[in-house]
């Protein structure tokens, strides 16, 4: 039987290590697709600080048997119940063990009142697209590119390839989407 996956809120003192671990996980796909990072870590420290401090944001450690194996930043809107998975990662050393899906299930269970989940990923991140669509049940709702810019991320160019991205949503059972 696999070890249990649990979630724990990150404390302010945890954020520097959380940031570093997230940036290491995100860098893998960018380096694989575009080569070495030229302009510092991705996402940038400033973007992560903004995500951590955003209204409704919750920073979560993903734990396997009490050991940190990843993290997530979610934005919870208790009024509309339309929530966002802003950032999600599994530590590279723990890839390929089914932890991502189990962690996502734990997030869904932590927020049972959610009507709709929203998330996004760069176009080149085929592994993420497969994960969200085929493993977690998200649907692609938009493809942002030079001819159809993302209205929620104007001018964001943190790293190569981010100018083309998919937006996803998952309508939870018993809910209807109202966008």
Question: Where in this protein do the model-derived segments appear?
Answer:
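Conserved acetyl-CoA binding element of GNAT-fold acetyltransferases
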Residues: 81-92, 120-121
């Amino acid at each position: 039987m696999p070890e249990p996956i649990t979630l724990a809120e990150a404390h302010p003192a945890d954020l520097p290590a959380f940031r570093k671990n997230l940036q290491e996980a995100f860098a893998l796909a960018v380096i694989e697709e575009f080569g070495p990072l030229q302009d510092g870590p991705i996402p940038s420290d400033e973007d992560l600080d903004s995500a951590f401090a955003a209204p409704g944001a919750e920073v979560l450690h993903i734990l396997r048997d009490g050991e940190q194996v990843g993290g997530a930043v979610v934005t919870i809107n208790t009024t509309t119940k339309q929530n966002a998975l802003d950032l999600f990662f599994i530590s590279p050393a723990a890839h390929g063990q089914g932890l991502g899906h189990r962690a996502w299930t734990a997030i869904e269970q932590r927020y049972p009142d959610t009507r709709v989940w929203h998330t996004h990923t760069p176009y080149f991140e085929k592994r993420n697209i497969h994960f969200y669509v085929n493993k977690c049940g998200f649907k692609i709702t938009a493809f942002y590119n030079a001819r159809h810019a993302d209205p929620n991320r104007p001018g964001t160019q943190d790293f190569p390839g981010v100018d083309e991205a998919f937006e996803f949503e998952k309508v939870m059972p018993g809910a209807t989407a109202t966008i």
